[in-house]
Amino acid sequence: MRQSMPNIVVVLISALLVGACAASGSRVSPAESQVLFVCEHGNVKSLMAASYFNRLASQRGLPYHALSRGTAPDSTTVPPAIVAGLLGEGFHVAEFHPIAVSVADISKSRRVVLINTALPETMHPAGIPQELWTDVPPASSDYAAASAALRRHVEALIGDLSPSDKN
């Protein structure tokens, strides 16, 4: 019985680490390239875009995974209306916790997409393509319009990925 106790501890710690990674959105395998979506608070537009991107990339068999981050997270949760809207589309984000964007997030990314925001001056690593989406309306006041705009952009982004990245 004594020898099985360390095994149980290892299993519990492993489970906690896997859960923490899933909640933070950091599930990029070595074979995947990371796309980083950034909005101001990190809990609405970037979360919606990352959700749409991950589903579409998976459906198309692309080696990409997206993360959601914020330049100035002001909450530890996702607004209930956004949770409900995304749940209606098959995304379970109730346990998601917004995270502030870091230089490491940007450095690990193949592409950075800024949604109605800008990166802080100290976070502009050279050589990483960035694009700005300025036409996404607030999801809190018009979820359907924000969803449509984000889906349109995500479709174009996936279509724009280099052919060598799609294999």
Language-model region placement:
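Short, polar loop motifs at secondary-structure junctions
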Residues: 115-121
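Bacterial signal peptide processing site
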Residues: 22-24
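Conserved active-site segments centered on acidic
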Residues: 26-101
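Bacterial N-terminal signal peptides that target proteins for export
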Residues: 1-9
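Bacterial N-terminal signal peptides
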Residues: 8-19
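A short, aliphatic-rich alpha-helical micro-motif
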Residues: 106-107
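Conserved acidic residues
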Residues: 110-112
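Phosphate-binding/catalytic loops
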Residues: 121-167
